[in-house]
Amino acid sequence: MKTLFIAPTRNGVGLTSTALGLLRALERQGLKVAFLKPIAQTHEAAPDDSVHWARTLAHAVTPDPILLSVAEEQLSQGQEEELMENVVALAREAAAGVTGGADVLVVEGLALNERNVYAGPLNASLARNLEADVVLVSSLAGVTPATLADELEIAAQAYRRSDGSGLAGYVLNFAPLELDFGGLLADLRARSRILASGELPLLGVIAQSPTLAAPRTLDVARHLGAEVLNEGEARLRRVTSTVVTARSVPKMADLFTSGALVVTPGDREDVVMAAALSHLSGVPLAGLLFTSGSTPEAAIERLCRAALTSTLPVLRVETNSYNTASRLSRMEARVPHDDLERMERTLDFIADRLDTVPLGTRLRAPEGSERRLPPSAFRYELIQKARAANKRIVLPEGDEPRTVRAAIRCVEKGIARCVLLAQPEKVRQVAEGQGLTLPDGLEIIDPDRVRANYVAPMVELRKHKGLTAPQAEAQLEDNVVLGTMMLALDEVDGLVSGAVHTTANTVRPALQLIKTAPGVRLVSSIFFMLMPEQVVVYGDAAINPNPNAEELADIAIQSADSARAFGIPPRIAMLSYSTGESGAGADVEKVRIATRLVRERRPDLPVDGPLQYDAASVLSVGRQKAPNSPVAGRATVFIFPDLNTGNTTYKAVQRAAGVVAVGPMLQGLRKPVNDLSRGALVDDIVYTIALTAIQATQAREGA
């Protein structure tokens, strides 16, 4: 499924009508289209305009948006990641609402206004995390070509991905009827590099339409809070002009035309009679509006009764004519929820003027191998898969504060059934110290009460090494060893440790008691690096100090398979300090041999090396340094030549760029054991528990 994100370049560009008009145009192309407004435009819980029209006119099964107040609170508390995960969940729900699955999801961004100054960056983040191509919506009302070109250029740069992709096109609304279209387009292209290059194609120019902008007389009455003296056809007639009676009737008579709203004090008998005569002569006036709380004298009312009590709407307000006209000029352009006819005509009008044939072809194209997995989608899928797995995960550092908090969160969210190895009273004290309540589903096992149960099984597992019972008892004093024995005996499905222990403390018992999976020659590790635009894999950055060429090939294959298992299309870059044939020496040759071995063992995996990091990750550099590479500039799996390089790089990227690193996730063990960084945050521990739960499912399936 492809996603289109509809984004405004400024306020008042007709965002909602364009988004829904595009939806209609794509449906005419035979595409199955879903719709989503992820964040509501207002703080109130009232029905969002976009959602209302999508459900009413497009019959879309679209979920309720996140309230703007909720989104603002999450942003203010630094919880943008959680907000984006919720948006991804809504996108999945919207797509699932289309029978047989949607071909495309149309997502409407937030309109820009003075109240939500954060909307621009938030829209860019939404588009990025939904892996969406962006349609920019702008307006020709009140701007010069120079301003419009700058506006489109700036917006396009904000949404354009680092590889130049991500722009689907732009739409111009409210075009003057006398517009010199060819001249405007030439002017815009001369002023904007992106428009000149064709990266941002024009999808349509929507002309101004006074008819579509015309509210019903009923809408005017609601806006003014007017008293309805005679409803007549107030629900049917539309206001296309306003006549404020400041002159004599002979000088205004020509203005009494179809759709005119006549605004007058009730004591202007000449105007009242002229309006009545116009109505009786067959002119469908929009209505007669009395100002200053006045009405005509009784004698005039009797003379005009045939008109004033028929289909002509008659209203009254307390304000004077000047203030009333001023309020009318400030009437919102939005279409009321009960004006289906106007919105239907608006959507058809826009859909008729959008060139969606090329866009439809693009949207029908297969996903291919260039798909990216955005961070929010990765986190969402991680949690959903872990919930579905419902695995029991042991945490040997059971009274460590971050671990306790993470375990509580996992149990409360149904991510995993966590088992804390610690004295129950100590865990309760840690929880109370953080203001937390231990949930009923959180299991706490006192290790002192169960250690003896594992002495004999451990001696049996290690009898080939001559392990004695006293030695086993001593080793089982270490909770990591105890937890590993629980895993070896299938009492739990996975183990997570390392918040206070070293990597060696976590991995050594696993290698001794769990051992490697069948056919696996070594254990390695990967980090999932949650870059701004996509999730990539770094390996090995935690386990193997200096792998040889064969081991490096094994690490690459393991890492690619892990990437694919977690939804990341693997494109392997075998990293070195040189690219292609430009370097020589033992270090480069090791990478070159490892690359050849990967190709021989797994011809299904796109791989290239040696590649420098910039050639592997930056498209423009990759095209220059390795123009014929299937991976350069698009790598998703980065294999480092040694631990020194890998660990240093992952920490540099994590800290300098503020990138979340999930892991390390160990690969190659018969059952899942995962290590934590001693600087791990609570979120890091939660995601590592989720990874472990998913690995446990994969281990069962592969057994």
UniProtKB/Swiss-Prot annotation:
Give the chief site where it resides. cytoplasm
* Superkingdom field: Bacteria
Keyword vocabulary terms for this entry: Acyltransferase, Cytoplasm, Transferase
Q: What is this protein called?
A: Phosphate acetyltransferase
- What PANTHER family does the database record attribute to this sequence? PHOSPHATE ACETYLTRANSFERASE (PTHR43356:SF3)
Query: Which molecular function terms from Gene Ontology are attached?
Result: phosphate acetyltransferase activity
* Organism name: Deinococcus geothermalis (strain DSM 11300 / CIP 105573 / AG-3a)
Explain the purpose of this protein: Involved in acetate metabolism.
SUPFAM superfamilies recorded for this chain? Answer: HprK N-terminal domain-like (SSF75138), Isocitrate/Isopropylmalate dehydrogenase-like (SSF53659), P-loop containing nucleoside triphosphate hydrolases (SSF52540)
